[in-house]
Amino acid sequence: MLFRSGKIINILDTPGHKDLAEDTYRTLTAVDSVILVVDAAKGVEEQTERLMQVCRMRSTPVIIFINKLDRQGKDPFELLDELEDKLDISVHPLTWPINMGSSFKGVYNLQEQNVRLYTPGKTRVEDDDDLLIVSDLADEILDIKLDSDAGKLREDIELIEGVYDDFSADDYLAGITAPVFFGSALNNFGVFELLTTFTGIAPSPGKRETDTRIVEPHEEQFSGFVFKIHANLDPRHRDRIAFLRVCSGRFEKDKPFLHTRSKKDRRFSTPYTFMASRKSIVSEAYPGDVVGLYDRGDLKIGDSLT
């Protein structure tokens, strides 16, 4: 995913169901940061606690998105307490919901000090769409647009600013603090604020530890590992795709790479990159990129190429 800032973010979506937990854990080995999605009504579920334990073990920084604010859910302050209690991490809200359910009005951005108004059923949100710029929380435009919810918003923000210190990106990177965002993923609402912050604070592709040494992303020699294998990804064909995370150097289409387990060279003429259900052939890939490789059964999870 290419952002206007020129940064490329590779997002790996994983299932939240506990029956598919193993697939999620494997994917966590290939990422440098994590976005945990929490249901506003259900709160922190058992599977979320387990995922957080893995993130803590791997020192992976975490951002939390509290979802489904367009439905009735738990009180936002109650959710923050639950996150800290069950996930054992300090949290810091960077956006704040204005009511919820059928009365959901939008979110207040504590960093930018603006309000994004919510329009039910609208799924396309631009960076300046429905954005309400306010001079401060005393701005009368809040009373005009939010009606009685303006007073509650002022009280909530005053409480938040009194409880929480300034947000520290260093604490986020160290896994000490998790920034929290609110919204509705189904309506693509509140996601822009999350991703804008994510591109500013998330770590670049990091080093990877192997059995013999630590691989740095700036090394010229190519290296990568298989973290997932998916069979029959295309229902029209009997295919088998191995997903490879590039750790260092440059992956190139048709170039021979050593499969370290078999000690044999492998070439890949149709390496793919994926965007949801769409896929396209790529000629090269760099550290942090994920490439799909057609596999005849020779590759296994954990295999390395160099």
Predicted segments with their positions:
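Structural and coupling elements of P-loop NTPases
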Residues: 1-306
